[in-house]
């Protein structure tokens, strides 16, 4: 699935959003947003007053009351439109996902063997624990774990990546996703979910917002907005008896009308952020999907914005992950060429990046050409987790290369001696951030091959940006402490965890959380699952195991560990957008005071005309201008709510100052200009 950024006001989206905005006028929908529900009730009240004026049941200006009622309905519709546009973008993304999900058949097995009896069943009938055989050309019918076999799988329908991936039993690449397609070979898979619970189903549900619940910050902000609304409601309600009393006492003017009080209330309550709050949350999840990351909830996106500790795997995130041979360091009594020759021989059949780089380096340094192991009557010894060595047996020569402790045991078991000088070479390589690979022939240590893991370009600058934002970066690696310290210094991370185990990762996360910090991490293996489940933001790789994906609260479809940094940026942008628009909305009220208060009460208290600093044409024009501005500002802020405010890496204090200047001062000044321009237009049209 390819996630293209859709234009905010794309005609098809706007048409759908307009229809949805009208449907959302249902009171069962409106009451979920308390601030806009007050506007909704005000719209009905002023509409009824307008109808009463038209029918002669009460007195008043039908033109003025009708205009106020119309623009209050527009205010509600514009808020509905903002939410509908955000949801529309998500629904379009969900539609493309739903296109991936199609009815298919599965070959259900009675036991986990490729030659076991099979039964053809509908994929929708499969249950957790069922076994299926998937062959070349078949669509994977369910999410599951590969128990037998290995195959090339096309996951482009889910990830958008056209290159096929290998899925095989054992290891961290044993997970398959329903809706993908097997290109070659076969797999025996155990289903790990029931119908309706697949990864694709969860993606569709989250993208559509069907399970969207308000996040803690959203709930807290809603409580604040409701409290402000109640305060302004009580204040406005007391103005009517105050107005009646003032008119009787001064024998001047007339009591303020219900229509004017409703207009005043709507202009004073925080309708701007109230109307855009839901859209901001939906758009945050949509932007996350645009980055090819599926968030299981808005809570996860919000937590990403609050993160202050990042745990980053060294390989693939900080370094390129393909270690290259950079130097031959011979032991005393051995020439560099002798070491290079032995290292190359032991690597001729080694297809790892490290092995190929040793062959290339020997060729570059000493013009040692590749040789055919078969013609040499040689036997290649592959690497194994038990021996932690690989090598070659050539006639009487027994050459091995591997980790320091593995070669030490090998040499000593052959009654050899491990020279202290080689220990010094190993320490020297580790101190510079390299990985030492020791080469031995029989019982004799020949020297060390230095493998250099290249730190990604620009990663140090990105970590510096994160540091400015108050985020601590911690590198996680299985390397020894010396190597880890050197790479950490080169990459510019704040701390590191060397010789990391799953238990050590989990303990580190708990330690930071005990200090009140929020922790983010990535993982792809079953052994990462406990740490992923503990972390506040846990991004599981789509290429990883089912256990890892279930433990995380986000899944990266690109399986790119570096994406964690982008996830944090998107989360922070969502929080900043919400805060900026809240500041703008509350600052807006000041200009509306200066517009409506003199208009409502100047006839009784002429001294209040001094507050008419905008020199608005008439009381009715002033009130109508404020109501129109209040509605239109929601429309103008929809793009900002959906795209997010511009984001720069800086400290929280600097961000606060910047946003107060832009959105606080802007919120104060823009309404003065906007209301005055609308007043001039109404006057020119003879509507004021």
Swiss-Prot record:
InterPro entries in alphabetical order: ATPase_P-typ_cyto_dom_N (IPR023299), ATPase_P-typ_P_site (IPR018303), ATPase_P-typ_TM_dom_sf (IPR023298), ATPase_P-typ_transduc_dom_A_sf (IPR008250), HAD-like_sf (IPR036412), HAD_sf (IPR023214), P-type_ATPase_bsu_IA (IPR006391), P_typ_ATPase (IPR001757)
Membrane topology term: Multi-pass membrane protein
EC number, UniProt record: 7.2.2.6
GO molecular function, one term: ATP binding
Binding, ATP: 350, 354, 383-390, 401
Cellular compartments per GO CC: plasma membrane
Residues that span the membrane, as ranges: 34-54, 62-82, 219-239, 260-280, 594-614, 622-642, 662-682
Residues that hold Mg(2+) according to the record: 524, 528
Keywords on record: ATP-binding, Cell inner membrane, Cell membrane, Ion transport, Magnesium, Membrane, Metal-binding, Nucleotide-binding, Phosphoprotein, Potassium, Potassium transport, Translocase, Transmembrane, Transmembrane helix, Transport
Domain of life: Bacteria
Major localization listed first in the record, in broad terms: membrane
Protein localization: Cell inner membrane
Active site positions: 313
Matching Pfam families: E1-E2_ATPase, Hydrolase
Alphabetical list of Gene3D superfamilies matching this protein: Calcium-transporting ATPase, cytoplasmic domain N, Calcium-transporting ATPase, cytoplasmic transduction domain A, HAD superfamily/HAD-like
Catalytic activity: K(+)(out) + ATP + H2O = K(+)(in) + ADP + phosphate + H(+)
Physiological role: Part of the high-affinity ATP-driven potassium transport (or Kdp) system, which catalyzes the hydrolysis of ATP coupled with the electrogenic transport of potassium into the cytoplasm. This subunit is responsible for energy coupling to the transport system and for the release of the potassium ions to the cytoplasm.
Family statement drawn from the similarity comment of this UniProt entry: Belongs to the cation transport ATPase (P-type) (TC 3.A.3) family. Type IA subfamily.
Subunit structure: The system is composed of three essential subunits: KdpA, KdpB and KdpC.
Protein name: Potassium-transporting ATPase ATP-binding subunit
Organism: Yersinia pseudotuberculosis serotype I (strain IP32953)
Gene name for this UniProt entry: kdpB
């Amino acid at each position: 699935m390819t996630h293209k950024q859709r234009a905010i006001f794309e005609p098809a989206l706007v048409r759908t959003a307009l229809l949805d905005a009208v449907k959302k006028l249902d009171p069962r929908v409106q009451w979920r947003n308390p601030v806009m529900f007050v506007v909704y009730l005000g719209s009905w009240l002023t509409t009824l007053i307008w109808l009463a004026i038209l029918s002669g049941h009460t007195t008043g200006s039908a033109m003025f009351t009708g205009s106020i009622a119309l623009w209050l309905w527009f205010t509600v519709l514009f808020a509905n439109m903002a939410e509908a546009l955000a949801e529309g973008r998500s629904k379009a993304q969900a539609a493309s996902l739903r296109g991936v999900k199609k009815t298919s058949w599965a070959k259900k097995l009675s036991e986990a063997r490729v030659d076991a009896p099979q039964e053809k069943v509908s994929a929708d009938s499969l249950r957790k624990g069922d076994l299926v055989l998937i062959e070349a050309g078949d669509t994977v019918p369910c999410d599951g774990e590969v128990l037998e076999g290995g195959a090339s799988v096309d996951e482009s329908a889910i990830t958008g990546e056209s290159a096929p991936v290998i899925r095989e039993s054992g290891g961290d690449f044993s997970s398959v996703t329903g809706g993908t397609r097997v290109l070659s070979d076969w797999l025996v898979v155990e289903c790990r979910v029931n119908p309706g619970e697949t990864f694709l189903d969860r993606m569709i549900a989250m993208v559509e917002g069907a399970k969207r619940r308000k996040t803690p910050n959203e709930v807290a902000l809603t409580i604040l907005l409701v409290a402000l609304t109640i305060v302004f409601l009580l204040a406005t309600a007391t103005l009517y008896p105050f107005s009646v009393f003032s008119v009787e006492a001064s024998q001047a003017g007339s009591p303020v009308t219900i229509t004017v009080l409703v207009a005043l209330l709507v202009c004073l309550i925080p309708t701007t952020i109230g109307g855009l709050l839901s859209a901001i949350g939906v758009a945050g999840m949509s932007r996350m999907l645009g980055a090819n990351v599926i968030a299981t909830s808005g809570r996860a996106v919000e937590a990403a914005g609050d993160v202050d500790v990042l745990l980053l795997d060294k390989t693939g995130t900080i370094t390129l992950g393909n270690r290259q041979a950079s130097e031959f360091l011979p032991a005393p009594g051995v020439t560099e060429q002798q070491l290079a020759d032995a290292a190359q021989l032991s690597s001729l059949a080694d297809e790892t990046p490290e092995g190929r780089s040793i062959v290339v380096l020997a060729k570059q340094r000493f013009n040692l050409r590749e040789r055919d192991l078969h013609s040499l009557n040689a036997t290649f010894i592959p690497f194994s987790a038990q021996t932690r060595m690989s090598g070659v047996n050539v006639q009487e020569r027994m050459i091995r290369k591997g980790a320091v402790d593995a070669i030490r045991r090998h040499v000593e078991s052959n009654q050899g001696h491990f020279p202290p000088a080689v220990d010094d070479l190993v320490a020297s390589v580790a101190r510079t951030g390299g990985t030492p690979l020791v080469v031995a022939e029989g019982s004799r240590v020949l020297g060390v091959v230095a493998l250099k893991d290249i730190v990604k370009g620009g990663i140090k600058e990105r970590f510096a940006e994160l540091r400015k934002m108050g985020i601590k970066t911690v590198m996680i690696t299985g390397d020894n402490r010396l190597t880890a310290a050197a790479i950490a210094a080169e990459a510019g991370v704040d701390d590191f965890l060397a010789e990391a185990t799953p238990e050590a990762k989990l303990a580190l996360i708990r330690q930071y959380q005990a200090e009140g910090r929020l922790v983010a991490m990535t993982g792809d293996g079953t052994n990462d699952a406990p740490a992923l489940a503990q972390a506040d933001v846990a991004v599981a790789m789509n290429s990883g195991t089912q256990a890892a994906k279930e433990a995380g609260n986000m899944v990266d479809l690109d399986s790119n560990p570096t994406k964690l940094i982008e996830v944090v940026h998107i989360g922070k942008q969502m929080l900043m957008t919400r805060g900026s628009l809240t500041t703008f909305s509350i600052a807006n009220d000041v200009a509306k005071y200066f517009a409506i208060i003199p208009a409502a009460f100047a006839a009784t208290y002429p001294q209040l005309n001094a507050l008419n600093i905008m020199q608005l044409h008439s009381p009715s024009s002033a009130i109508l201008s404020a109501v129109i501005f209040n509605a239109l500002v929601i429309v103008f802020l929809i793009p900002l709510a959906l795209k997010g405010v511009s984001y720069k890496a800086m400290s929280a204090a600097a961000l606060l100052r910047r946003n107060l200047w832009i959105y606080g001062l802007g919120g104060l000044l823009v309404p003065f200009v906007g209301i005055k321009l609308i007043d001039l237009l109404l006057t020119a049209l003879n509507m004021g």
